[in-house]
Amino acid sequence: MASKSDKQVTVEVKNNNNGRNRSRSRARSQSRGRGKSVKITVNSRSRGRRQNGRDKYQSNQRVRNIVTKQLRKQGVTGPKPAICQRATATLGTIGSNTSGTTEIEACILLNPVLVKDATGSTQFGPVQALGAQYSMWKLKYLNVKLTSMVGASAVNGTVVRVSLNPTSTPSSTSWSGLGARKHLDVTVGKNAVFKLKPADLGGPRDGWWLTNTNDNASDTLGPSVEIHTLGMTMSSYKNEQFTGGLFLVELASEWCFTGYAANPNLVNLEKSTDKQVNVTFEGSNGTPLIMKVPEASHFARTAVARSSLPTTLARAGQNTTSDTVWQVLNTAVSAAELVTPPPFNWLVKGGWWFVKLIAGRARTGTRSFYVYPSYQDALSNKPALCTGSAPSGMRSRAAVMTTLQFTQMNQPSLGHGEMTATLGRAIPSPGDTFNVVLTIGQPLAPNTLTKQSWLNKTTVSPQNHHVVKIAKDVNNYTTMQGFTPISSVDWYTTDFQPSEEPTPIPGLQVLVNSSKKADVYAIQQYLNNQTNNKVQLTSIFLVKVTTSFQVNNYLSYFYRSYGTGTTVENLKVRSDTTAQDVNFPVGWYLMTNTAIFNAPAPPGWIWQNVELLNDTAYLIDQGMMHLIMPPPANTQLLFEMRTSVTGSRSMISSEEPDTHEPGDEWCDALDASDSRVFLEETDYEDEEDEDEDDEADRFDLHSSYGSEPEDDDENNRVTLLSTLINQGMTVERATRITKRAFPTSADKTKRSVYMDLLASGLSPGNAWSHACEEARIMGTNQMPNVSGDRGHAE
């Protein structure tokens, strides 16, 4: 290059403006769309003799360094790399071809924060960590390594093609079209390496790409590598299709980064695989193309958990969408099996697309996503619009089971945090009240849509059979009467924002012969005055059967008979019963119980266990509306329900003999919270205790630890409780303060015995049982049973 003494190397940098002048205020950025011609002059040192090989190399290297320095000084090569990182990323396996046609097996996006394996985690390596710290990236080289997982003679019938997609945009590409790209054909059973140079990988900003995937798609994604297969994969040893993996895919490259700009949340982008998911597409003329997947699928649950939903409402007839974009890759079934409304059949046939979660919940147990033909369209919220509906003969086809690989493309919030805060969604906590929308399922035999609803009438069952009990413990339970199957449950907050499904209510369960069959998720009670001295209580329970079971019960139904003239009789229960089997498969059910007892009803949750009465008028209250006739399938019921039981107590029906013994209410099963309260109590009161005592002291009441007789304490308890409730205090808090101010003899005895037995080494359960027995003896002067709280001092 500089072998002669008079040799000059000329590199000149000029701006090519195509003869157009621009003012300084309108000058374009040097990093975009400007042609450059380069001219640099280098004078070599004169030498008196011919250069040998070493001198020639040094001279060439000197010239090369000078040229590189001058080019960088003129801004032709963009910013200097701040750090470079070599890494080998394992991306997963290439599966076999199942249809015989062109199938996509992998789509590898080269942005460093997106280069992850599909293991379902957010773990990251050095490349992802650097991508979250720097604003620009580029590749020095890229090698896609395919390591064979089968022998050359083990399978046949399939060829693999690795190709470069410079725009990272889905396209309608045939096998011949893939051959028009830069590509490499690979024979199954042999290792291969697809090599790409910087000229194939350069970005729009002097070879650099932006790292933040929230920016323009054409500046951030970089090129992508797609891997397709053609021809059905057959086993050479068996006359059957081969379904295993063909290649292990690894990415060996050197990423360079520059421009420090920390976006730590970019390392948490998730990539995973849902191997068994039903996918359907919907759309009509002029409406966006919608992809639907089951609400319980891994993809739907992940998208809901990691998507940010706006709280603003959309215009009429429109839906709001999440800000999070997902790339979806279909790798399991032929695109011909997925029925798609026109004109975007090619998009689904291509095997990968982009989606965004639609806010709210579908009412069929599915999650809906808008489909986008490119990442830029997804960022701009321009979904694919259909020009028609799917062919009428294909609309009734069942959903196709497939495998979806999905990648979280962006993170709306780039600051610290494992995941974005999901706006408009609430994570329920115990005690929350929810609006619950129940979608009715098919009637449960023997019920039909054309006849009255059968329900269990009695609290006993035929011989060798058992009733269904919704129970807190052996003393607090109710018998199931009505049973309505539910196909899906939608949870909303009190202001009707979509919410996650809560956990089952601790301590509540559905029992058959002391065996747990279901969990209880939500409850509610409706109390109405039935007559002047009677009240009607209807309890509803939303339960999820975890183990299918069958019961045989005495069934009856409600009926309404017409009187003379314009008078109409109230709802009554048929006195005759029929013993019938009822099967409960796994799933959701709404169970009910209605009871009539003497007024007044105490506050708190009431456990009643009486059978439906003959010749007694029942009111059609809020919890019984669906028990007259079975509601049609897919209709919906709305209830405001609770997710905890507080202040519960048992009631003895006036129709049953009173076998209640003094002290019974103090001997429920010991809960973990009871034990914790006792153990945390000391001789020194904490700040909360002092506040409660102060509230009690304001009423100038005396402690029961003094010399006042027990009957005076009883009057004081009633007075204080009524005063606190009238002042607007909750029943639970008023009861707690009253018990602390005037504990009963049973309270004192139970607490003392319990603490003594614990100190002696007895287990909490046994200590509680013995304390209850002592409290039973001392329970002659008990506090009025205003709630189901335990009888200990709090």
UniProtKB/Swiss-Prot annotation:
Residues 1-72 are annotated as: Basic. Residues 681-697 have a biased composition (Acidic residues). Residues 650-794 are annotated as: Acidic. The record marks 315-316, 395-396, 425-426, 649-650, 658-659 as: Cleavage. It holds the Pfam family Astro_capsid_N. Belongs to the astroviridae capsid polyprotein family. This is Capsid polyprotein VP90. It comes from Human astrovirus-3 (HAstV-3). The lineage of its organism: Viruses, Riboviria, Orthornavirae, Pisuviricota, Stelpaviricetes.
